[in-house]
């Protein structure tokens, strides 16, 4: 027998009261995005669960695509059959025969929401269990911790059989908690910050600053590849490329070297905030980890944050670098993040950046610039690309094509 669908059990959605269907519909849309590479698959949601109808698609590939999606508590590949006793007996015998090995233990666990069905759960357990013994005389029944628990569910529309329970990613469906702008540098920390925000239901748009010719097409490709890795957790992500060359050249020529990083980060934050307002997001997200680099001391954060009153979420702020790396490896962003391409935060990095910048000094140096004009031109020049979770192509080949 072939699996007919994947049954998705909802995670924290069961606690969301009046918003429950909104959250479920959000999860359904995210699943559809993640499974866009499987056009034959259809998705149907109810208050209790979501049904992913395979329609001939490979069940293992679909399961692997669903496992990282936030909002899913668990997955079970199921066989959908007619809800008649003879059909159920034949199905149970076929399934258990395919699983049988010497010494295997099993139990049947039935439940019914269709109370018009001819057998109650207890009688159905006995009938189907007897059918298994008829087909496999040497198999053993075991009520506690058997090797196989064959679940049989009688619903209004059909009967469903399953014997696998696969753990989902948990969390909330991406988008259920609103939208935030992720400042995505291309390093190790910011993709992890994006991942942790996605887990709590925040839809992210990735804001990446590019300064050609100082930053290369490879650096831009790297940031897009990181964004694509993040799409596995909740579907499509808007990638926003910000032209930053003019601003970085201005800062380099007009400000003291020790303040380059502070001024650069203040401009980045202003621009991200302007894009956030334009695109109706609620928060800014970044990968700052306290004390990790000069711009991430409390004094630096205070001086940089002074340009906005928008909430800034820092999911990795209290993590050690090794903790962040561990998550990056788990979500498959680490190998991309360590590719040796320069980004906007490294190309003009001073040898001795200020770790305790005085706000009065920062504002005095900033008075040398046309701040509003620089920000407006950067925002006007953004390029937005929708990144999807389609099957990835070789990044090097893609980069060569772009260069040609």
Curated annotation (Swiss-Prot):
The chain positions of domain THUMP read 60-165
Name the Pfam families on file.
Answer: ThiI (PF02568), ThiI_fer (PF22025), THUMP (PF02926)
Highest rank taxon of the organism = Bacteria
Q: Which InterPro entries match?
A: Rossmann-like_a/b/a_fold, ThiI_AANH, ThiI_fer, ThiI_N, THUMP_dom, THUMP_ThiI, tRNA_STrfase, tRNA_sulfurtransferase_ThiI
Classify the main location. cytoplasm
The UniProt entry's GO CC annotations, sorted and at most eight, read: cytosol
- Give, as one word, the top-level EC class: transferase
Q: List the disulfide bonds.
A: none
- This entry's Enzyme Commission designation comes to 2.8.1.4
Q: Which GO biological process annotations does it have? A: thiamine biosynthetic process; thiamine diphosphate biosynthetic process; thiazole biosynthetic process; tRNA 4-thiouridine biosynthesis
Record family assignment: Belongs to the ThiI family.
Tell me which UniProt keywords the record has, alphabetically: ATP-binding, Cytoplasm, Nucleotide-binding, RNA-binding, Thiamine biosynthesis, Transferase, tRNA-binding
Enumerate the subcellular locations listed in this protein's record, separating them with semicolons.
Cytoplasm
> Which pathway is recorded for this entry?
Cofactor biosynthesis; thiamine diphosphate biosynthesis
Physiological role: Catalyzes the ATP-dependent transfer of a sulfur to tRNA to produce 4-thiouridine in position 8 of tRNAs, which functions as a near-UV photosensor. Also catalyzes the transfer of sulfur to the sulfur carrier protein ThiS, forming ThiS-thiocarboxylate. This is a step in the synthesis of thiazole, in the thiamine biosynthesis pathway. The sulfur is donated as persulfide by IscS.
Which GO molecular function annotation, any one, does this entry have? tRNA binding
Q: Where does ATP bind?
A: 183-184, 208-209, 265, 287, 296
Q: Which PANTHER family match?
A: TRNA SULFURTRANSFERASE
Protein known as: Probable tRNA sulfurtransferase
Q: CDD domains in the record, alphabetically?
A: PPase_ThiI, THUMP_ThiI
Q: Which reaction does it catalyse?
A: [ThiI sulfur-carrier protein]-S-sulfanyl-L-cysteine + a uridine in tRNA + 2 reduced [2Fe-2S]-[ferredoxin] + ATP + H(+) = [ThiI sulfur-carrier protein]-L-cysteine + a 4-thiouridine in tRNA + 2 oxidized [2Fe-2S]-[ferredoxin] + AMP + diphosphate; [ThiS sulfur-carrier protein]-C-terminal Gly-Gly-AMP + S-sulfanyl-L-cysteinyl-[cysteine desulfurase] + AH2 = [ThiS sulfur-carrier protein]-C-terminal-Gly-aminoethanethioate + L-cysteinyl-[cysteine desulfurase] + A + AMP + 2 H(+)
């Amino acid at each position: 027998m072939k699996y007919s669908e994947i049954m998705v059990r909802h995670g924290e959605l069961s606690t969301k009261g009046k918003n429950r269907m909104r959250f479920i519909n959000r999860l359904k849309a995210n699943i559809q995005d993640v499974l866009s590479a499987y056009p034959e698959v259809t998705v149907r949601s109810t208050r209790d669960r979501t049904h992913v109808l395979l329609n001939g698609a490979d069940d293992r590939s679909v399961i692997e695509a669903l496992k990282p999606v936030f909002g899913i508590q668990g997955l079970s590949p199921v066989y959908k059959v007619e809800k008649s006793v003879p059909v159920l007996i034949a199905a149970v015998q076929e399934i258990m025969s395919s699983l049988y090995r010497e010494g295997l233990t099993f139990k049947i666990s039935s439940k019914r929401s269709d109370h018009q069905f001819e057998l109650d759960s207890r009688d159905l357990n006995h009938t189907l269990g007897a059918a298994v013994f008829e087909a496999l005389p040497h198999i053993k029944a075991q009520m506690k911790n058997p090797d196989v628990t064959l679940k049989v569910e009688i619903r209004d529309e059909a009967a469903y059989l399953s014997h696998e329970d696969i753990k989902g990613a948990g969390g909330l469906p991406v988008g259920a908690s609103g939208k935030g702008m992720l400042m995505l540098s291309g390093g190790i920390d910011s993709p992890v910050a994006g991942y942790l925000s996605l887990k709590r239901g925040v839809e992210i748009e990735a804001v990446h600053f590019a300064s050609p010719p100082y930053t290369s097409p490879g650096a831009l490709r790297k940031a897009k590849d990181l964004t694509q890795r993040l799409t596995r957790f909740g579907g499509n992500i808007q990638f926003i490329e910000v032209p930053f060359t003019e601003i970085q050249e201005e800062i380099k020529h007009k400000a003291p070297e020790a303040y380059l990083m502070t001024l650069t980060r203040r401009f980045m934050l202003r621009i991200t905030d302007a894009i956030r307002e334009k695109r109706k997001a609620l928060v800014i997200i970044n990968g700052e980890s306290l004390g990790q680099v000069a711009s991430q001391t409390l004094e630096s954060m205070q001086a940089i944050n002074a340009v906005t009153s928008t909430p800034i979420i820092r999911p990795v702020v209290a993590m050690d670098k090794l903790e962040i790396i561990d998550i990056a490896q788990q979500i498959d962003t680490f190998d991309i993040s360590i590719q040796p391409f320069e980004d906007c935060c490294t190309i003009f990095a001073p040898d001795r950046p200020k770790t305790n910048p005085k706000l009065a000094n920062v504002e005095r140096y900033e008075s040398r610039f046309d701040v509003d004009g620089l920000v407006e031109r950067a925002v006007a020049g953004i390029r937005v690309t929708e990144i999807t979770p389609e099957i990835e192509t070789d990044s090097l080949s893609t980069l060569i094509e772009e260069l040609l």
